[in-house]
Every structure is written in structure tokens, then in C-alpha cells.
């Protein structure tokens, strides 16, 4: 499998790196198209979790969600490694976009804020109704929203996604953007994603000047928030 992967793809550059994963920009040698390769290794539990999530979202077909082209296992020397091949988005994160547009006295128009907000709501409508059960993203934030070179919104990073009917409690998400129930480990619900989109809209309206919850973990924040639902 290791040789087959490298026979098909040329690694262009490393995009990011963490303890158990590396993300690369790669080029398909035959099709001559760029894609993203996410390679996870060194932790069997994490690899199994990510593989399960990849299978959860592999059949999603929506213009604002990156396509998953392939899922491979054991591409390296580590038998627990997996690789997810995804659509490459040539663009910038919403956080970078807002910073660029509002820097040096610039302005993000109401029309643009509404356009991005509507596209995010269209994504949620699709995800929450997918296959009758729905899929919850559970980590919507400016860093997980991309705008391609044409300005089209793309929602990325489904690492925390769960099936809508799973009835699972969640303690994941990003401070400031996670809904109150995520802080206290309650059941995942569609409203959690809606809350996060609302916080993203606030981020745009305030031109990125909203306070974060740095220094606070999810478990320590419930006392500072009232339940909204």
C-alpha cells in the first residue's frame, strides 16, 4: 500500500503537522490535479476514530463540503496508519479572510456577511437532513471555514462529526464557538451547530474583535453560561 500511494501521488509540500498526523498538498500523477492527503499514525485508537468519521462523511455530496476521494490504510511502516485523500481548496480560512478585509481600516460589508451566513445555513440544512438521520459537525469556527478563490464557502475538518441519531454526549469543540451543552458533555444536538454558526456570524460582524475563552477548557466554562435551549 505504501508504494501504491506514492506511485499515485507526488507530495508537493507539508501543510500542517501534529503529534499523530501530517497533512500534505499532493498531486495526482495521472490526473494532474491537486488534493490534500491527511496521514494519521502512531495511535491505534485515534486512527480507528478518524477512520470511522471518514466513513461517516464519505458519501456527502454538496458544493460547500470538500469531497473525500479515497481512504487508505497502512500506507507507511506503521500498520495503524490511515490516509484520507480530500479535495484541495485553493483559498483562505474565514479568519484570515476577515483579517485581510478589515485590516488597515477596511470593512466587511453586510451583504458579504449575509452571503457567507446563508451559505453556512445551507450546509447545515444539508448535513442535518442527510440520509434521514443527519450529521452534526460539532466544531464550526472561522478556522474550519474556507473561502476558495471564487469566494465560495467550504466547511472543513469533520474530526468531531457524529451521526445525528447517535445519542452521544460530547465534550469536544472550540471555546467561544462551542454551544453550552458541549461544555458540559450533554447530548449532541442540531442546535449545537446552529449556535456555532451564530458565533461565526458575530465574529464577522465584529470584524474578528470578540473575546476568546483562552485559558478556559470546556469542562470549566458551564458556570459562566446559561443553557440556551
Predicted regions and their residues:
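AlphaC helix of the eukaryotic protein kinase fold
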Residues: 41-59
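Activation-segment/catalytic-loop signature of the eukaryotic protein kinase fold
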Residues: 71
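Conserved short submotifs of the Hanks-type protein kinase catalytic core
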Residues: 77-93, 97
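Activation segment signature within eukaryotic-like protein kinase domains
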Residues: 116-117
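Protein kinase catalytic-loop region centered on the HRD/HxD motif
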Residues: 121-135
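Conserved activation segment of eukaryotic-like protein kinases, specifically the C-terminal portion
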Residues: 168-182
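Conserved catalytic-loop aspartate of Hanks-type protein kinases
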Residues: 193
